[in-house]
Curated annotation (Swiss-Prot):
Residue ranges constituting the S5 DRBM domain according to the UniProt record: 16-79
Domain comment as written in the entry: The N-terminal domain interacts with the head of the 30S subunit; the C-terminal domain interacts with the body and contacts protein S4. The interaction surface between S4 and S5 is involved in control of translational fidelity.
Keywords, sorted A to Z: Ribonucleoprotein, Ribosomal protein, RNA-binding, rRNA-binding
Protein name stated in the entry: Small ribosomal subunit protein uS5
Subunit structure, interactors included: Part of the 30S ribosomal subunit. Contacts proteins S4 and S8.
NCBIfam families xrefs: rpsE_bact
PANTHER family hit by this protein: MITOCHONDRIAL RIBOSOMAL PROTEIN S5
Any one Gene Ontology cellular component term annotated for this protein: small ribosomal subunit
This protein's encoding gene: rpsE
Organismal lineage: Bacteria, Pseudomonadati, Thermodesulfobacteriota, Desulfobulbia, Desulfobulbales
Gene Ontology molecular function terms on file: rRNA binding; structural constituent of ribosome
């Protein structure tokens, strides 16, 4: 389901990549039968280090997607990236799901599956190795991936926090 991709202009004329991760049909049982509605997990990113996710719920699929995109745009996080990959390896956690993110050299490509791939493509990561551990629920995988990306720090940021220069940190 994650192969669906659209680019749309934001109010700020900013191009964002929208990826639908999962669409779920849910039913509410009432006296007269079942009432169906839909939920959609959507990931939005600028392809340059900003990424967010949103869950939209509605009676129709397009409306659920629209609500998910709207929520994802409101809740975007800035991710620290290097030229070709991420600065260091990290494990993102959410619930019973864990996602292991490991930097890769140029030319490796995006080695990830399903929801993790959608998040990383929207964030603009092009070379990375990933492994999903624990729960493979799309909700948990998306949130664990974004948690891992939020933990990333560049060498400059770490040096600034420690009050040292970059050469002392990388040596």
């Amino acid at each position: 389901m994650s192969d669906f991709k659209r680019s749309k202009a934001n109010n700020n004329t900013e191009e964002l990549i929208e990826k639908i991760v999962f669409i779920n049909r849910v039913a509410k049982v009432v006296k007269g039968g079942r009432r169906f509605s839909f939920s959609a997990i959507v990931v939005v990113g600028d392809g340059n280090g900003k990424v967010g996710y949103g869950l939209g719920k509605a009676n129709q699929v397009p409306e659920a997607i629209r609500k998910g995109v709207e929520r994802a745009r409101k809740d975007m996080a800035l991710v620290s990236l290097t030229d070709v990959s991420i600065p260091h390896q990290v494990i993102g956690h959410y619930g019973a799901g864990r996602v292991f993110l490991r930097p890769a050299s140029a030319g490796t490509g995006l080695i990830a599956g399903g929801p993790v791939r959608a998040v990383l493509e929207a964030a603009g990561v092009s070379n990375i190795l990933t492994k999903c551990l624990g729960s493979h629920n799309p909700h948990n995988m998306v949130k664990a991936t974004i948690d891992g990306l939020k933990q990333l720090r560049s060498a400059q940021k770490i040096a600034e926090l420690r009050g040292k220069n970059v050469e002392e940190i990388t040596a």
